[in-house]
Amino acid sequence: HQKRRKADPARRLAYSALLAVETHGAYANLALADHLRAAKLTGRDAAFATELVDGTSRGTGTWDRIIEAASCRAPAKLQPGVRVVLRMAAHQILAMRVPTRAAVASSVDLAGQVIGERVTGLVNAISRRISTHSLEEWATEIGGRDAVDVMALRTLHPTWIVKAFQDRLGTDEVEDALLADNEPPVPTLVVRPGLAQRDELGSGTPTRYSPWGVVRPGNPSDVAAVREGRAGIQDE
């Protein structure tokens, strides 16, 4: 067969972090931070890996039910690495702006590299099947007439959280609140007074109350002052 393309560093890193969560019970954010530090990934690659880890782990309940519907087999019966690759594929296909062909091909390449060629046909078939519906369509097909279940699937939340939001907010506001809950927080970086200046934190929005901070999207470790311990991450 033709030589398999090498998986890109961002997807490999995301896979390694998510596999640590799956097999060792690691916390996704800590596993991601450790892997980003070790791989020295920055900029767009780090941002892509971060979205892939955050979104895949956040949507695990939804992705597993879609994988089961697409493959007619329980994800628990798949080996852990295959589960992780397929969840990543589902997140890219259904929740990110990754073109379907690229998401499927990169998932097959990743599986071939980190697990072995024997699983590439399976990953290819299930990923393609996942791509035949939108997230909305999968949620409706799987959830059926259970409106809470459909909303849970569509917003990547467990049903108990959807019910808790409904009890507090009422039905009309629930979906907007759940979707807002999925938005990644933007880090607030703050200098250690006397060790760094605010302008060393790069472009961002100056904090409202503190003269020492900046609200700045992206990976905090891209900032030299953070890497060197002269600045850190802190809520205002």
Name each model-derived stretch.
Residues H1-R227:
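Class I Rossmann-like S-adenosyl-L-methionine
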Residues E228-E236:
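Conserved SAM-binding loop and adjacent beta-strand
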